Amino acid sequence: MTTTLRATFTVQLTPADPIPGSAARFDLAKTWSGDLTGTSHGTMTTAGDPATGDAGYVATETFEGTIAGRVGTLTFLQLGTMAGGEPQLSYVIAPGSGTGQLVGKLGTLSIGDIDEDGNHEVTVQLA
C-alpha cells in the first residue's frame, strides 16, 4: 500500500572542497515540516553550467525525524539533470536505508513549487 504525504523543506547549501577535475561540491542541510518533520544532512556534487541550460547534480542526504508518525532515519538519493534547458529529477528513498520505525520503507519524492522564502513543496509516495 502506498501513502501520499506532503511536506516542505528549506535548504542551506555550503560550498565544500571541489572534487578534482571539475565537479563542485556542497554540504547541504534541510529542515522539514508537514508529514515529514525533522532534519536532513548530506552532500551534493554538481557539474556543467546551468546558465547555458546544460548541467547536473547528484545528492545523498540522511533524514532523521518523523514521517507520518513513524520515527527513524532514511537516506534520500537525488539525480538532477538539465539538457537544453529541460530539467529531469529522480528523488528516491534508498532501499535498505531505514532505521527505527522506518525500516523497510521505500518511496519517491517529487518537488513542486518553491516560494520566495525558499520553501520547497514536496509530495512523497511512501510504501
PLM regions with names:
Residues M1-A127:
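Targeting-peptide/extracellular-domain and disordered-appendage signature
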